[in-house]
């Protein structure tokens, strides 16, 4: 229905103003009906009886002139004689609605309280209802006999100037209110329009241009969070570009090497060299296969909504299986693996946890000096599960330590890994609501510590 927020707020505000005016009118009408109507009736009845008392004491020659004089004093009067003849004085009534029964009762000396007894009407205020049944009436004794006199104040005449003033006041009130509503709506919508333009810039890839935070209300909070979102999206875009560059480099280098080996393979007839080239190509393709596998795993971890973490895992047995699987690689370097494992159960994703712990052991074997030792420990600590793996090897600089868990980061340029192992491990541990930390002692003993919640209860 509304194509703009500006129109929606303006229409809603104007509707509220008009609806409030209507409700106020109805409530005022109710207040008059239940609180003022009876006292108003009594005041007018008192005035009419005082007029009768004066007429009886003063004995004016022409009773009609007397009523005419009352009419000129802003009263509306209707007289009815015993023959049913009606005479009106003052401003005319809008409608003659008085019943014959009411007239007969007054002629029989019974007072008429039409103002007090006026039925309630929701949208008609009895105070202003200019009809003959909305009057008070009493019997007047004249030389020509009894007459019924009905009277009410001429509200229109009495309040004509005030009514004009009130009408002007209401018109100005509505005009100023609506003008202020439109102006205030524009002040609300203007920053929203700026946000819209800023989102369009984001769609076009502009993550550098901030929007000025001009307010401290909800709009200002929205502006603040928009700027934070813009910064985050800019960082994500930089990471994406960096990721694409790294993947391109990791794939391009081995493909170039394979291309070179295939050229050499075509040009040589030496069986020994040909076999060496084939072995090298096989090694490189194996590395490429590992890279694609890890890239797919990273993508799975980034879009983890479908992953389940309800496997009942015997963690100590899982570590033993990993050690047994990597024992051959450790034996090739004459490494000793010492494991102190408590029997611990954990609820999580066994495939992913196996991958994370395997990465740490493979790294430890890779970077431990020949003849060295690797220490593995698993234990309870309060409400947590603590896993540590330590090994002695070459020291790592503080700069390298700070970037250790970045994707594609390699401590050494001569490292033949793809730099994804620790990044994958960190993502897996965090998906299990755990943490991983790296520490290094003065004796160049490096330690990875994984802390997981004890959720097996």
UniProtKB/Swiss-Prot annotation:
It is found in: Cell membrane. The modification Phosphohistidine is found at residue 249. Disulfide bonds: none annotated. It catalyses: ATP + protein L-histidine = ADP + protein N-phospho-L-histidine. The keyword Cell membrane applies. One of its GO terms (molecular function) is phosphorelay sensor kinase activity. Keywords: ATP-binding, Cell membrane, Kinase, Membrane, Nucleotide-binding, Phosphoprotein, Transferase, Transmembrane, Transmembrane helix, Two-component regulatory system, Virulence. It is an enzyme of class 2 (transferase). Its EC number is 2.7.13.3. Gene3D superfamilies: 1.10.287.130, 6.10.340.10, Histidine kinase-like ATPase, C-terminal domain. This is Heme sensor protein HssS. It comes from Staphylococcus aureus (strain JH9). The gene is hssS.
